[in-house]
């Protein structure tokens, strides 16, 4: 809940500390700004003109919840959680570890990580309000924040022990700012071959070439590689409903007409093997 993580939150306008007020119905900063806490338990922390990017729709969030809850990405979840646990063990010491997930979605990965790391607190940040509603109730030790990863993060400098980014936007400058000394960003990035069996028959978006190289180049001066990239690849057995949920939670959902997608799904086998393939990238604060 927000009261568990308010000590690491900051005013998005000027990064001054936030505290709860009026029985935690709002958060206020030392500079006098106030941010209402939604009845669902999340808070929107955005300065100026507010959130500038479109987040996942309710339909996309529901598809994500359906797909992930059936365990199709379990090896990805385990790998991310294990890496975060390794970071926390190394850098947290006697402090209560704080884990931030940027682009946390429904909180599926973050909740699993908090189950693994006893006593850790989680800050889930996402630009989508429908996602934040799920995120706020994903785990007792998660605080949900609606904020834009591309902007200055509403997080106090040097307050985060480990940071997760799973198939989500990355902001190396801000990640480095919020991490403690020695802290790491653990990033799961789709690799060439991910969902390849679905791309031609469904017309979904492909994985761009050189994503890993660009990530490392963009991080120069802020984050440095902490380990060699780890390839995670395995086959999934997916029925049509699971495939529909996978496409529905992805960026392709914004580009494909629903009727066209349904027609293409109907032409697929009732069950098919689909490749899951991603790289786990660990980068330490420079």
What is each PLM-predicted segment?
Residues 50-79, 83:
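Class I SAM-dependent methyltransferase Rossmann-like catalytic core
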Residues 150-162:
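A short acidic, Gly/Pro-enriched loop at the edge of an enzyme's catalytic core
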Residues 208-222, 246, 250-259:
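Short alpha-helix
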Residues 172-186:
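A short glycine-rich, Lys/Arg-flanked "PGG" loop and its adjoining helix->strand segment in the class I
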Residues 98-101, 105-152:
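Class I SAM-dependent methyltransferase SAM/SAH-binding core
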Residues 6, 230-286:
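Conserved Class I S-adenosyl-L-methionine
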Residues 1-54:
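N-terminal auxiliary segments of SAM/dcSAM-dependent transferases
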Residues 184-214:
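Conserved class I S-adenosyl-L-methionine
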């Amino acid at each position: 809940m927000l009261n568990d993580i308010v000590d690491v939150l900051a005013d998005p306008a000027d990064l001054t500390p936030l505290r709860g007020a009026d029985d935690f119905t709002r958060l206020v900063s030392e500079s006098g700004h106030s941010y209402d806490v939604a009845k669902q338990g999340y808070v929107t922390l955005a300065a100026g003109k507010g959130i500038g990017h479109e987040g996942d729709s309710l339909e996309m969030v529901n598809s994500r919840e359906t797909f992930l809850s059936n365990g199709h990405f379990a090896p990805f979840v385990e790998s991310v959680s294990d890496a975060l646990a390794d970071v926390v063990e190394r850098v947290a010491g006697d402090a209560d570890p704080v884990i931030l997930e940027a682009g946390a979605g429904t909180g599926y990965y973050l909740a699993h990580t908090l189950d693994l790391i006893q006593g850790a607190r989680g800050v889930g940040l996402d630009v989508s309000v429908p996602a934040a509603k799920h995120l706020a109730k994903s785990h007792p030790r998660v605080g949900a924040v609606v904020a834009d990863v591309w902007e200055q993060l509403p997080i106090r400098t040097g307050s985060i022990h480990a940071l997760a980014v799973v198939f989500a936007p990355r902001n190396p400058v801000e990640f480095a700012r919020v991490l403690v000394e020695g802290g790491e960003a653990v990033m799961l990035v789709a690799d060439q071959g991910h969902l390849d069996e679905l791309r031609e028959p469904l017309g979904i978006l492909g994985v761009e070439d050189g994503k890993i190289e660009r990530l490392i180049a963009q991080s120069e001066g802020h984050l440095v590689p902490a380990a060699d990239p780890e390839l995670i690849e395995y086959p999934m057995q997916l029925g049509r409903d699971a495939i529909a949920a996978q496409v529905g939670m992805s960026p392709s959902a914004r580009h494909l007409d629903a009727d066209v997608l349904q027609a293409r799904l109907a032409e697929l086998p009732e069950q098919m093997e689909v490749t899951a393939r991603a790289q786990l990238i660990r980068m330490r604060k420079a």
